[in-house]
Amino acid sequence: VKDCSGREKIMERRHFLKGAAIAGAGAALAAPAVAQGIKTLTVVSTWPRDFPGLGISAQRLCARIDAISGGTIKTEYFAAGEKVGAFDVFDEVAAGNSQAYIAADYYWIGKHPGFAYFTSVPFGMTTPEWNAWVKFAGGQALWDELSAGFNLKAITCGGTGAQCGGWFNKEINSPEDLQGLKMRIPGLGGTVMSKLGVSTVSLPGGQIYENLVSGSVDATEWVGPYNDYFMKFYEAAKYYYTGGMHEPGGGLAFGMNLDFYNGLTDHERAVIEAACYEENAAQPEEAMANNGTYLNKLVNEHGVQLRAFNDDVWDAFGEAAEEVFEETREHSDLAARINDSYQAALRDIGGFRAIAEIEFSTQRNRVLGMT
């Protein structure tokens, strides 16, 4: 990373990780009576080590678990490829070879399409809306039911906030411009794109840049300006679409082996949940604090051209999304119940936000000249 401020931010996070580890070690020394009862928690992730944004978040979470536990839990963190491949973490943890993974659960829609709803779906909930559904409107119970079928227990441990529409090597002025495009886009968003003639692939984050530069893909979505800046996608694609239908929230999962989870004490569960919920708040807040700054860097330092999908393209997205949701419901009773719960919460929670927060922010931005 050439940007000095970017290096400083990464170094700051590394200092946090080091500090948290020291704090955890200090707590362990202060409680020698429980030293022999230390529980090892092996965590595998879908992101490379020190990966800006998502990877740093995963490492920070593990350091928090160590620190909060007072030495009773010791995490062993393995980034993508260090123990298993990025997309192998689900099976690794389900089999009990590792105790937990940190990932976006929509990577597992090949196992069950219901997993998509526990990351994000097209035209779905924003991060705070999704958190409200998971924690207080029935989402966690459905997530538990879905995950238990694979010997897993998952809780939320992060969120990206609303994501951008993606990086393209040509402008998208009509739905027809999407036909024949090769794009990295996972989840049900990828299924929507497929219905519009896009050839989609789901690549781990660490493999996107090389495929974009080589021309193996013509476009990619990732997260937002803060995370995308360090990926250097601007070296291969100059058109950055600012609003995306595919991931309005981007929730992340801390998926534990169910047998391991059932063997935890109430205190150990509380420690893990506290660390996960703290990171669940920290990650989107970090992105929100930095997205504006890094969007300006992309435009002013690297000549990135911002674009927005027009109404015709958005309408095409919407029509395809309706088909995808209906097909998802037809998969199984559980898929239908997850979809129906999600959609009902979206209309309830999102409906209120539209007449309160969104109306306010729209008028605030107009009055202050921010639009």
Whereabouts are the PLM-identified features?
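Core domains of carbohydrate- and sulfate-ester-processing enzymes
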Residues: 138-141
